[in-house]
Amino acid sequence: MPFFHNRAALLAGALLATSACGGNGAVPSNAVAGNPSLRVGVPQERAISPDDNTSILKKLKKDVVIGSTVDPTNGDTGPRSIARVTISYGKLKKGQLAVCDFADASGTPGNGTSVDVLDPTPGSKPTTFVQSSKIQGCDGNALSSANNTYAAGLTSHVVVKYDQNGKYVKTYGTPINAPMTSGDAFCGQPYAPEDIYVGDSKDGGITKFAAGLYGNPRPVEVITGFGVNNGSGWGVLGPSGIRYNGTRHGSLCNDTLYIADGVDNTIVAISKASNLLTTGEIQVKPGGKTFKCKQKRFTCATLVYSGSPLNAPVALALLPNGNLVAANTQGGNRLVEISASGKLLATKSVDKSSIAHVFGLLAIGSNDGNTVLFYTDTKDNSVHELEP
C-alpha cells in the first residue's frame, strides 16, 4: 500500500475507533498532535509552485459581460464570490458559474440570501440555486467535487452545506464567527482529503473541516491571527480570497493554500495545507508578515507579497500557470498579478471608479494561451470575463 494510502487508512481506523468510543466520529485534535501518523495529507510535489514570470493579466485585453447576477426570484444584488462547476451532477452543469449575492434587492449589503447559477457565455441569464436566510450576507460559495455548495453568510454567522440540487444538508457554526469567504481544497486523488476553508472577519482565523470521507468533519480553527478591521458592509476586511493549488504531476500534488489579507495588504501561502489539523497550528504574528508554525515539518506559512500595489485586497484568483491575481477594494478597482514567489508582474484597472466593485475572481484555462479571468462587478451586478 502506498504511503499516502496507508496514512489515510490509519486515519479511517482512528475515526472508527473514536466513533465506537465517543460516538462523534471525529479525531480529537490532541490525538492527531500526539500521533503524527494520523495526519491525512497528500504527497506533495513541492511546497510552492515553480516560479512563472509570464504575465497573463497583460494578455487579457478584452472585457466581456457574461450576464446579470440579479436573482430572478427576490432581486438580490451585489455579486460577491464566484465558483465554477467542474462536473455535471444534480441541477448543476459542468462549466457553469455560481455566484453569491451579498446585497438584497434594495442594494443593502449583508442582506443577500441567494446563490445564483449562470452559463459562462455572453447573454446568460441567472437561475436561483439556493435562497435562504441561513446564508444572509452571502459572501462565499465553495463548490466541492461532488457539487455540494458551502455557502458563507457574513450576517448569519455560519456556513451552510447544500447538496447538488440546492437542498439543505448541514450548518457549520462555532468556531466560525463572521465568515467572509469559503474555499474548496482537493487534489482529486483516491483517498485524498477534500477540505473546506473559511476565513473569519471577526477573529482573523481560518477554519477547516472535511468535505469528504477523510479528515475531520468538525470545524477546527487551524490558523489564527490574520488582521481584521471590524468594518461593515462592503468595507469588511480580513482573511479572504482563499485559493488552493491542487495541480498534480502524476501522483504528486502541489497542496498549497493561498490567502489574501486585506488589512495588512499581504498574500500568504500555506504549504502542505492538507496537513493542517489542530487548533492554532499556524499563528500569524501582528503585521501579517511573520508566522509561528507548531509543526513545521508538516505545514507552515510563508509571505508571498506585501505592500503596494496591494490595497485592501479581498478577492484572489489562482491562474493555471501558478500566478495569483488579487483585486483591490481601495484606491480604485485594480487587479494585481503576482508570481508564486512574490514577483510583481502586472496591474490592470477594470473600472475607473474609486468605489470598490470587484469582490470575486476566478481563473480558468489549461495554458497561458487559453486562460481567462472572470470577475464579479457590483456596479452593474454582473459577471465579466477578461479574455485575450
Where in the sequence are the language-model features?
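Surface-exposed loop and turn segments in beta-propeller and other repeat-based domains
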Residues: P50-G75, G123-Q136, Q164-N177, R218-W234, ...
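Short loop/turn segments immediately following the C-termini of beta-strands
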Residues: F102-D104, G153-T155, Q164, D200-K202, ...
